[in-house]
C-alpha cells in the first residue's frame, strides 16, 4: 500500500525565507554598507532551503507513488519559476528600449554614480542568457551587465533543478542508509574548489558565481533532506536538534553582522553558512512549536517568504533605477515598490500558475488522498 508523504506545510520555513530575503534586499539597497554587511548569507540560506525542499518532495513522490516522473517535475518547476520571470524581463526590456539614453540605468546600485547608459545589445543578450539560466557564468567570467546581476542565483538553482532529479534516480538504487554519502562527497568537493581555484589564480568572481563552487548549499540541503526523510521514516530521534539549530542560526547571524565583502565571503562563507543552515531547516519542520520556529512564524516574515521570489526579481532593478536618488528616498521607495510588485505578481501571475501546475502532479492513491494538500502547500514556496 502507498504511504503518506512526510513533508507538510511549515510556516517557519516561510518565515526563514522571509528573513533571508530581508537580509539580501537590505544588502543590495545599502551596497553592503548598511546594518547587514554580510547580507549575502541570505542567498546561501535560499540554496539550502531549495536543496532540502526539492529533495524531500522528490523522496515523498517516490514514497507515495513508488516512482518519480521527471517530465511532471520539470513542468511544475517551469510553472513556478517562468511566469513571474518572463513578466519582469518583458517590463525591463520595454523600459530599457524606451529610456536607453537615460542615466537612470546606471551601472550598479551604490556604484560610483557615473550614470553610464547600459549597452543595449549587451543588455538584450543578457535577457537571453537569463532565460537560458546561464547568467551566473556570465558574471563568473566577469562580463555581465549590472541591472540583472541578481539573477545569477536563479541560474544556479535552475541548473541544480535540471540535474538533481537525475541524481536522485541513481541514489534511490542505494540502500537508504548509504544515500547520503555520495551527496556529502559532492558537497565536500564543492566546498574545496574555492581554495583550489584561489590558489590557481582565479578571481573571486569565478569562485563566487560558479555553479560548481555554489552547489555546496543545495547539496547540503539535500543531505539534510535525505537524513531527515530516513529518520522520519524509521522513527529514529535526532541528536541534540535544539542545540544544533540554535548554534547554526547564531553562526548565520555572526556572518551576517561581521563578514562583509572579502575573501572569506567567496572562500568559506557559502560552505559555513550552508552547514549552519542545514541544522536549522529540518529542526523548523520537526519542531513547529519551538521558540525558534515561533520566532520565524510571524505574519510579516511568512508573507514575505511566500512572496520572496517576486520581491527578489524586482528589488535589484529598483535599486539600480533609484540609485541616483538620496538613500532616504531610494530605499523606502524601492522597498515599497518591490513589495507592491510582489503582491501583484503573487495575486495575478504566480498563484494562477501554481494552480495550473497541479495538473502536473501524479494522482495519489486513494489511501493518501486526505493528506495531499499538505505537501502541495509547502511545494508552492519552493
Identify the residue ranges that each predicted region occupies:
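Interfacial loop-to-helix transition and helix-capping segments at the boundaries
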Residues: 7-11, 33-43, 115-129, 143-156, ...
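Alpha-helical transmembrane segments of multi-pass integral membrane proteins
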Residues: 56, 218, 222-223, 243-352
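Membrane-interfacial alpha-helical segments at the cytosolic side of multi-pass membrane proteins
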Residues: 23, 54-56, 90-93, 160-174, ...
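Functionally critical transmembrane alpha-helices in membrane proteins and complexes, commonly lining
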Residues: 8-61, 79-86, 125, 132-135, ...
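Membrane-proximal cytoplasmic C-terminal regulatory module of class A 7TM GPCRs
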Residues: 297-302, 351-382
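Small-polar-interrupted transmembrane alpha-helices in polytopic inner-membrane proteins
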Residues: 16-28, 49-50, 88, 178-198, ...
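Solvent-exposed interhelical
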Residues: 158-188, 225-243
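Transmembrane alpha-helical segments and their boundary/interface "anchor" motifs
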Residues: 60-101, 105-123, 129, 153-162, ...
Amino acid at each position: 500500500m502507498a504511504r503518506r508523504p512526510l513533508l507538510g506545510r511549515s510556516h517557519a520555513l516561510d518565515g526563514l525565507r522571509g528573513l533571508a530575503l530581508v537580509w539580501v534586499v537590505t544588502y543590495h539597497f545599502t551596497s553592503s554598507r548598511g546594518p547587514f554587511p554580510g547580507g549575502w548569507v541570505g542567498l546561501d540560506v535560499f540554496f539550502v532551503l531549495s536543496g532540502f525542499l526539492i529533495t524531500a518532495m522528490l523522496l515523498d513522490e517516490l514514497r507515495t507513488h513508488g516512482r518519480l516522473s521527471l517530465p511532471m517535475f520539470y513542468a511544475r518547476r517551469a510553472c513556478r519559476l517562468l511566469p513571474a520571470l518572463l513578466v519582469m524581463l518583458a517590463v525591463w526590456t520595454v523600459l530599457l528600449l524606451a529610456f536607453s539614453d537615460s542615466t537612470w540605468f546606471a551601472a550598479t546600485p551604490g556604484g560610483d554614480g557615473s550614470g553610464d547608459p547600459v549597452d543595449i545589445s549587451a543588455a538584450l543578450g543578457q535577457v537571453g542568457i537569463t532565460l537560458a539560466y546561464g547568467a551566473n557564468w556570465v558574471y563568473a567570467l566577469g562580463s555581465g551587465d549590472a541591472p540583472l546581476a541578481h539573477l545569477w542565483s536563479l541560474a544556479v538553482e535552475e541548473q541544480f533543478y535540471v540535474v538533481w532529479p537525475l541524481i536522485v534516480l541513481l541514489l534511490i538504487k542505494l540502500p537508504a542508509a548509504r544515500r547520503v554519502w555520495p551527496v556529502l562527497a559532492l558537497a565536500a568537493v564543492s566546498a574545496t574548489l574555492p581554495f583550489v581555484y584561489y590558489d590557481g589564480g582565479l578571481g573571486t568572481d569565478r569562485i563566487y558565481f560558479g555553479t560548481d563552487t555554489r552547489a555546496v548549499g543545495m547539496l547540503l540541503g539535500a543531505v539534510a533532506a535525505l537524513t531527515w526523510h530516513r529518520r522520519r521514516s524509521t522513527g529514529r530521534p535526532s541528536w541534540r536538534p535544539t542545540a544544533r539549530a540554535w548554534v547554526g542560526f547564531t553562526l548565520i547571524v555572526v556572518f551576517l553582522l561581521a563578514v562583509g565583502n572579502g575573501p572569506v565571503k567567496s572562500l568559506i562563507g557559502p560552505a559555513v553558512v550552508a552547514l549552519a543552515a542545514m541544522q536549522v531547516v529540518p529542526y523548523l519542520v520537526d519542531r513547529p512549536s519551538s521558540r525558534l520556529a515561533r520566532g520565524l512564524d510571524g505574519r510579516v516574515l511568512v508573507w514575505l517568504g511566500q512572496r520572496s521570489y517576486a520581491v527578489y526579481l524586482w528589488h535589484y532593478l529598483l535599486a539600480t533605477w533609484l540609485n541616483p536618488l538620496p538613500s532616504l528616498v531610494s530605499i523606502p521607495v524601492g522597498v515599497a515598490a518591490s513589495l507592491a510588485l510582489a503582491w501583484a505578481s503573487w495575486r495575478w501571475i504566480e498563484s494562477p500558475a501554481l494552480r495550473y501546475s497541479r495538473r502536473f502532479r501524479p494522482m495519489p492513491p486513494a489511501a493518501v488522498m486526505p493528506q495531499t494538500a499538505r505537501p502541495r502547500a509547502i511545494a508552492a514556496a519552493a
